[in-house]
């Protein structure tokens, strides 16, 4: 990518992740949430079809978590980016994901369609409790 084009794209991504007003600040002064968004911009500059996020909100303050979740949801729903989102926070998973895999010791216990849960007026936590607290039957 030519320098001018790279700079333009970088500026666009910084704006997209909400850091355009932080450009003069050294990255060492960024909060954990800001660093997560900067890392996301770094990945997005490569135009991926899929991104893998492993516990992306860990260490981020509650306000920053909500902001980051909204950004991920926007990338997935509006931009059509495939996001593999690994988290122990069911509320975050429910906001971001279309399908959820429940794993234990590296084994898939269930693959859940979030639209189906909504139709049944169930919460992801109900399914989670079924498998992990009640010893529910595994679906392989």
Each language-model region and where it sits:
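Conserved ABC ATPase signature
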Residues: 26-30
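Catalytic Walker B motif of ABC-type/P-loop ATPase nucleotide-binding domains
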Residues: 51-54
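Conserved catalytic motifs of ABC-family nucleotide-binding domains
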Residues: 47
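Conserved ABC ATPase "signature" region
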Residues: 2-22
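Helical segment within the ABC ATPase nucleotide-binding domain
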Residues: 66-78
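Conserved H-loop
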Residues: 80-86
């Amino acid at each position: 990518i030519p320098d001018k084009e790279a700079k333009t794209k970088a500026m666009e991504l910084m704006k997209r992740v909400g850091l355009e007003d932080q450009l003069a600040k050294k990255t060492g002064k960024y909060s954990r949430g800001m660093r997560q968004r900067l890392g996301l911009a770094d990945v997005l500059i490569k135009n991926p079809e899929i991104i893998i996020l492993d516990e992306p909100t860990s260490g981020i303050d509650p306000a920053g978590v909500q902001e980051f979740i909204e950004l991920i949801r926007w990338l997935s729903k509006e931009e059509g980016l495939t996001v593999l989102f690994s988290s122990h926070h069911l509320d975050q998973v429910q906001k971001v994901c279309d399908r959820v895999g429940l794993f234990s010791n590296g084994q898939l216990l269930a693959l859940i369609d979030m639209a189906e849960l909504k139709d049944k007026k169930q919460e992801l936590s109900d399914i989670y409790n079924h498998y992990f607290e009640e010893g529910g039957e595994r679906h392989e």
